[in-house]
């Protein structure tokens, strides 16, 4: 793909596009139109997502109002309770949550939420941002349905600066108000198929949604551009295997697009011999990495291929928190590609993820490697990757997908 078109796509999509919103739909339509311009005909596959309109979100600590954003889908109501800062996850610390509104560090995942409920917490406060950054941005977060399992307590998100100030001042009592209208909305995957000589399928995935503060250039319009570039390359060629490009919606909300795709196409998943995923490439710093949820032979092959074509790649056997994982969980070997930026050189899920993080030459280099790998897999007489998931990866899939708690 020409550099000017790559840069134009980044410019045209430089806005927030949370899963299930009209902005996400707008980008889906844009991707479909770009596909048409390349000679392909993409289709929408819609799926249902939880949505909420926050009408009111207020937080007071010892009478002082703290700027906050209410958690989507946590319910509505008003609380007054003692504040408790959960600085440790050990049993004694958790036992002190009973009857309290609990301030927690880090992300509110499934197991932490279950611990809060089991120990009698009545509400929660999370925080994000960085005390060293000038902004006071607050991310919009949600209590995901697979986390709550229908058991909801009120929650808000605040800026890290306020969290530190609250703990430093030994905050005692909290009043929390959240009012919202919860409903079902629509997100969509954008799917383009390029028929091959056989009915074996290789899937290509990249998500196009962003988080609530982010333009999502690095995470993950870069991956979307990668897929568009590869579609441009393979359209009109004679390909041994069928190619299916899937721009996934609502990845940032829990891999919802790729999960929906696998659920809707259960009967034909056995035809998919390999999944290739792109999530965050082309940044200025760092090097190309491939995360393979597959046999070690694929890991070694990618390392050798990097030497062969002169584009270094660091390949590892691991689970990737991206749209490759639902496919791997269905027994499909996957290779996910990213360029991991060193600490302090690029950041995601905030307002700093813009086109400024991207270097077009690195985009083209990363895409060239992924395309070279894909072409070999597409046209191999027999797909060289065993269609199996090793036991050690199955164990990690169980942990990642919350079927088993990590020890």
Regions found by a protein language model. Give the residues of each.
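Noncatalytic luminal/extracellular "stalk/propeptide" segments of secretory-pathway proteins
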Residues: 3, 7-98
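N-terminal capping segment at the start of a domain
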Residues: 1-23, 38, 132-145, 209, ...
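Alpha-helical metal-binding/catalytic segments enriched in His/Glu/Asp
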Residues: 35-36, 106-107, 117, 200-255, ...
């Amino acid at each position: 793909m020409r550099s000017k078109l790559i840069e134009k796509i980044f410019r045209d999509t430089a806005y927030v596009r949370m899963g299930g919103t009209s902005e996400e739909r707008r980008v889906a339509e844009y991707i479909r139109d770009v596909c048409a311009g390349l000679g392909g005909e993409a289709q929408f596959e819609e799926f249902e997502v939880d949505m909420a309109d926050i009408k009111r979100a207020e937080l007071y600590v010892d009478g002082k109002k703290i700027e906050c954003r209410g958690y989507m889908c946590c319910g509505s109501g008003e609380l007054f309770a003692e504040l408790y800062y959960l600085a440790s996850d050990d049993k004694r610390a958790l036992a002190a949550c009973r009857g309290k509104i609990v301030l927690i560090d880090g992300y509110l995942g499934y197991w932490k939420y279950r611990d809060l409920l089991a120990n009698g917490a009545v509400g929660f406060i999370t925080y994000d941002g960085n005390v060293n950054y000038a902004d006071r941005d607050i991310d919009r977060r949600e209590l995901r349905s697979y986390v709550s399992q229908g058991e909801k307590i009120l929650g808000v998100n605040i800026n890290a600066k306020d969290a530190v100030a609250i703990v430093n001042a030994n905050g005692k009592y909290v009043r929390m108000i959240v009012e919202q209208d919860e409903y079902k909305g629509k997100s969509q995957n954008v799917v383009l198929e390029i028929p091959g000589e056989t009915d074996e399928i290789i899937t290509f995935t990249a998500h196009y949604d962003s988080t609530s503060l982010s333009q999502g250039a690095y995470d993950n319009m870069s991956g979307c551009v990668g897929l568009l570039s590869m579609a441009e390359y393979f359209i009109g060629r004679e390909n041994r295997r069928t190619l299916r490009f899937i721009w996934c919606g609502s990845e940032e909300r829990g891999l919802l697009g790729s999960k929906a795709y696998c659920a809707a196409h259960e009967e034909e998943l056995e035809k998919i011999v390999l999944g290739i995923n792109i999530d965050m490439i082309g940044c200025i710093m760092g090097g190309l990495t491939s995360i393979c949820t597959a046999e070690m032979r694929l890991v070694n092959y990618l390392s050798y291929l990097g030497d062969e074509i002169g584009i270094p790649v660091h390949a590892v056997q691991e689970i990737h928190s991206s749209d490759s994982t639902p496919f791997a969980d269905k027994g499909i070997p996957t290779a996910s590609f990213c360029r991991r930026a060193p600490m302090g050189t690029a950041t995601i899920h905030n307002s700093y993820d813009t086109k400024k993080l991207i270097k077009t030459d690195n985009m083209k280099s990363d895409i060239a490697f992924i395309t070279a790998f894909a072409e070999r897999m597409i046209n191999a007489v027999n797909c060289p990757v065993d269609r199996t998931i090793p036991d050690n990866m199955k164990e990690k899939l169980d942990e990642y997908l919350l079927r088993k708690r990590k020890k």
